[in-house]
Amino acid sequence: MKVLIISAEVWQDKTNGGNVLSNMFRNMDWEFAQIYCNPGMPDNMICKKYYQMTDGMVIRNIFSHKPVGKEFEYISGEKESDRREIELPNQKFYGFFHKHRLGIFYSAKHFLWNISNWKNENLKKFINDFSPDIIFAPCYGDQFMLRLTRFVGQYTGKKIISYISDDHYTLK
């Protein structure tokens, strides 16, 4: 079975969301791919195929028409310096917005994602090449993540499995 995971965070065993994914799927002999929407390098032993979209890519798309999204394969244990095409977190930039969780920032972010071309041929190629049997997408309290999940579900015609965690509907 091929499972396409759609999540906001990168799949790292050391983070809460990544640890949950690893614990859920560790003993399954399935093939996994992930679409994620934040900077960072994956680090897990389960998933090898990734498609990354970030706020920075969205901004570059709006101002310079560079495509949103990067497809890559990752083998656990690779050094971050070996993966230069992956967008890594800018702690100062993201730290500011994490510290100052104002509604205007969320509105601006969603506006930028809405006017960018994230539903592009690169994303469709990644989805087509992987050809998932099912889509697994945690249910976030985030308009864009819900829109992305809906798009992928409609594009593939595949069933979506989702769940709600206890901390996704608060700004704290």
Label every PLM stretch briefly.
Residues 1-80, 156:
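N-terminal subdomain of nucleotide-sugar transferases
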Residues 3, 134, 138, 149-171:
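Active-site proximal beta-strand in glycosyltransferases
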Residues 10-14, 110-115, 172:
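Short, flexible loop segments at the rims of nucleotide/cofactor-binding pockets, characterized by
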Residues 17, 21, 119-120, 145:
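Amphipathic coiled-coil/heptad-repeat helices and related helical stalk/stem segments
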Residues 74-134:
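Conserved nucleotide-sugar donor-binding subdomain of glycosyltransferases
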Residues 116-119, 146, 169-172:
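Nucleotide-sugar donor phosphate/pyrophosphate-binding loop at the beta->alpha transition
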Residues 139-143:
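Short, solvent-exposed amphipathic helices
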